[in-house]
Amino acid sequence: MRADAQRNYAKLLSAASAAFTESGADDASLEEIARRAGVGIGTLYRHFPTRQALLEAVYRDQAEQLRARADELLASGEPGEAFASWLRALVAFSSTKRSLTSAMVATLGKDSEVMSTCSKLIKDSANALLARAQEAGAVRADVNSTDLIRLVHGVSMVTEYAPGDPGQADRMLTLILDGLRPQPAG
């Protein structure tokens, strides 16, 4: 892909991600996405022939960003802090991408290739960070990544259905993290 085409692709993904977050995956205008990206609608359709293709690309891009964040955190930092930082990133992803995820599942089904690939990226990242945190004694040994991901989805659902408290997700995640720490013997 030419350099200008790559830049346009990246700008379209960024604009679409913002529009889907603000307006919902079904209601965001493709013309508005193209305008925000600073390209014509024809450029949008050359990269993404359908709304579904754009949805898939945005979802995959966001999952890859979570994986990249996990890789950064695995390479540096204290294991417990790295684990908590990534869970906060996962809460943000889950909270802002709920309509996108719902649209993907409704259109493709939860077992589609793109959903499976993205779920695997997220779960593999969670497994790696969790194992490192458990080895360091920062997280209880009986915790698994499936439960963690479900807890995060629960936090995002609560914050979606009870808006108006911007600190709620962080407080809930702090409670979860406190519960994940090993308890003193006694």
Can you say where each PLM-predicted feature lies in the sequence?
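Base-recognition residues in the alpha-helical recognition helix of bacterial helix-turn-helix
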Residues: T21, R46-P49, D61
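Short linear capping/connector segments at secondary-structure termini
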Residues: S102-D111
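C-terminal peripheral helix-coil segments that are non-catalytic and often amphipathic
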Residues: D124-V139, Y161-G186
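Short hydrophobic/aromatic patch on the recognition helix
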Residues: G38-F48
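Hydrophobic alpha-helical connector segments
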Residues: A57, A68-T96, K110-V114
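Short alpha-helical scaffolding segments that buttress acidic/His motifs in well-ordered protein cores
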Residues: L87-L90, V152-V155, I176
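Basic, helix-initiating cap at the start of DNA-binding domains
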Residues: M1-S23, D27-R36, A53-E56
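Hydrophobic/aromatic residues within well-ordered alpha-helical segments
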Residues: N8, V58, Q62, L66, ...
